[in-house]
Amino acid sequence: MNPKASFGKGSAASCGVLNSPLRGIVQLTNSAALRFRNWSFNNKKYSYAQNMLRLINFPICCVSMTPLLTETHSSIERIIKKEVKLMKILGINASPRGSKSQTRKLVQAVLDGASSQGATVELVDLSRLKIEYCIACGICYETGKCAKRDDFQTLYKKILSADGLVMGSPNYFHSVTAQMKTMIDRMADTVHCQLLTGKYTVNVATSGGAGQHKQVIDYMDEIMLNFGSFITGSLGVSARQGIKAWANAGTKAFLLGETLADNIREKKNYVKQSKILRYNRKYFQDLVKLFKNVWIHEYEYWEKHDWK
């Protein structure tokens, strides 16, 4: 790339300080920061180099770049990681059709949008995992651990460590697939302890018949709110809408991914959702108190967090 071509008015280049050493730093910074391409600040897009100079807290205009001249590639990466908390976003596809799944493609499009804004993303296909049915034993309430030993434990750790989630399911008789429902049923202590508090979710649904995806989206929105997550947005499309609708859905999904990353970075507050989340939090706290002698782990969890 030509560093001069990327810097606009008011930048170091336009101020006449883009000398040869600085060019080297710009190129070095670029190579350390490909994951941050198209990062936006105040709704404005910048080049890789401009983003990195912002992220490591060096003013763009009329500054001495001498401190950077001694930094190695690894040092710059270390500075970037220290200054910017990388977002982790997990996509969960509940369609059993693998690479043929339209739902999977839309989930991936959301993840691509988030990735373009600096997020680290991962896509999981539920159909590839062995997740058994919940047997309502109540062990998770008592100990915080599930009695079952399968792939759910690994997936659950990823869910809890993620900053954002992208949930995708096709319409199966006016609801999510069996794979999605089985996973949700294994998350009972998640709702009691509101363990997705502070996270953001995008829900994606597809259907054959016109409008049938709406029920699926409504269901997933309600579930994720009950778990404590904000809903950044949702997207649905049906086969009856035609090929053009699918193409448009892909574009919308990418934009939703960008918005999801922005929400996480800015810690966006949705006022109406916040009211629901506060109500849910109080409701489940009271429920846990009522069964404190049986739901030992959950009571201890809320005690540890001062019931906040």
Question: What role is predicted for each listed range?
Answer:
Residues 1-12:
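Extreme N-terminal basic, low-complexity initiation segments
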Residues 27, 46-50, 73:
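Low-complexity, intrinsically disordered or signal/transmembrane-proximal segments
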